Amino acid sequence: LVAPYLMEGFDAALISKSLSFLRKDNVFMEISAPDLKTDQVEPWFNVPYSLSVGEIETVGFKGASLNLPPANPYLPNNLTLLPEDNETISRVTDRPDLQVWLDTDVTFGTPRANTSILLLTDGGLSSQKDRAYAELYRRLVNDTLSTTVYPAYLAGLGYALGSSEAGFSISLNGYQDKQMQLLDTVIDHLFNAELTQERFATFKTGLIKDWQNAAKDKPYTQTLSALNTLLVSSSWSPAALADTLAPLSLNELKKWQTGKLAKIGVIAVLHGNVSAKDAQTLEDFLQQKLPMAAIAKEKSSVADITEKLLLNLDVDHNDAALLLYVQDPDDSFASRAKSGLAGQILRSAYFSSLRTDQQLGYVVNAGIRRLNTRSGNLFLVQSPKAGAADLELATLTFMQNYVDSWQNLSDAEFAQQKSGLISRLTESDKNLGQRSQKYWQNLNDENYNFD
């Protein structure tokens, strides 16, 4: 159910051989904790550690018994493939507090489905405080679910819990038969997670450390993050998020969670081996389970670049990096198509010029960068030998030279590039998940034509 293979035989000799390696003298144990006694320092990363060789001590296992796990409640009973209806995705429920979209799709021949649910919260989760708190709460809920949903994973089901400026999202994938049971579990934990002070402190410390460590990311990675923070209204720097989270207490997080989940609007998509009956079951479940209300979807905005913006980053790294972003004039499909074609034409030429010819850096890329529904052309390079000013000059020189030589591009070459982009954009979906993702992206963009 989990893997794309089937175990059909029982190999006692192989199992015995594998078990023979489970010995006290054949164990590697790593302990990571604060205030450990160490006697050595790793020279490259300056990390203190200690190393001891010998058998490990085993305690606390006397009298332990082994038992088979209980029956897996998520094992599918119904694996019947529905008949293909040849209909496109459509909205089967349209209420102020609930939208449900459905596409019965058995093109890929498996009794699987993908369910995506956006839980709209009043005011969204777009502020610096909301983004920080939501990420911590998301991690804590996943922690409380880890043991509970493991049987679902073994039964071929999966879930993901996310957050955005609009609210929390839940996605389910796998055999459709027991997805509602898994959804019930996930929603119950999202609304009623039993959080302890110990786990709260552990995850809060870990998240703050993750955000603080973003300052140690590769320079080009930091430039991409800074671009988002600069232009997207709901994007905040890792350092700012860490500072916001630092004074938070468990009681404050619980109070925030209660307020944010007091009223919920829902947008849901069912795609795959699912029918109108499944959509109605989902609607009834959500109506019973959630405090439904008409909630406006919070949308982040992207700032217009009306003049040259220069942002200098203080990066603790020997390399220098440059990111140059040319924003589309608007968010129309026409503008996105033009910048997409420009990105395809420029990609190999930019790489060839800065990486191959000038050997300025090992990270060289030209393409498009989409922020919400607004796209633009991006030029990115990281170099161990040239400074940021030199990288900027090299990029601007490349752009000017390319513009000057534009007339040398033949009609046949241009048509070939355009045809290549069209082929890539219209490429058939390889699996159910890829098609589901396109549906979800179009709904987020409010492109109800799904083109």
What are the residue ranges of the model-derived segments?
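Hard-cation-handling environments
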Residues: L1-I31, K37
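Glycine-centered hinge/linker elements that transmit conformational signals in sensory
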Residues: L282-I295
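His/Glu-based metal-binding/catalytic segments typifying zinc-dependent metallopeptidases
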Residues: L1-A3, A33-D35, P43-L136, A293-A349, ...
